[in-house]
Amino acid sequence: MLKMGVVLFIFLVLFPLATLQLDADQPVERYAENKQLLSPDERREIILHALGTRCCSWDVCDHPSCTCCG
């Protein structure tokens, strides 16, 4: 009888809790989906900005066609 109670407890209480999707997980998934839609150039800009680095040298940044710093 005790074994049946343990099995019922696992399937009726623990299993639904383990499969429950938390609300806090959803914005992170939505943010990750939005990041996948970015082009490679946009991703590179975000990563370089976060790292604090530049994709070109200082003398090239004065050029009007520079898309890195502009």
Swiss-Prot record:
Two short peptides are produced from this precursor; Conotoxin tx3a-b is amidated at Cys-69 (but has no bromotryptophan), whereas conotoxin tx3a-a has an unmodified Gly-70 and a bromotryptophan. Two elongated peptides are also produced; Conotoxin elongated-tx3a-b is amidated at Cys-69 (but has no bromotryptophan), whereas conotoxin elongated tx3a-a has an unmodified Gly-70 (but has no bromotryptophan). Disulfide bonds join C55-C68, C56-C66, C61-C69. Expressed by the venom duct. Is present in all duct parts with a highest content in part 2 (proximal of the venom bulb) and then decreases in concentration toward the end of the duct. The modification Cysteine amide is found at C69. It is found in: Secreted. The cysteine framework is III (CC-C-C-CC). Classified in the M-1 branch, since 1 residue stands between the fourth and the fifth cysteine residues. This is Conotoxin elongated-tx3a-a. It comes from Conus textile (Cloth-of-gold cone). The lineage of its organism: Eukaryota, Metazoa, Spiralia, Lophotrochozoa, Mollusca.
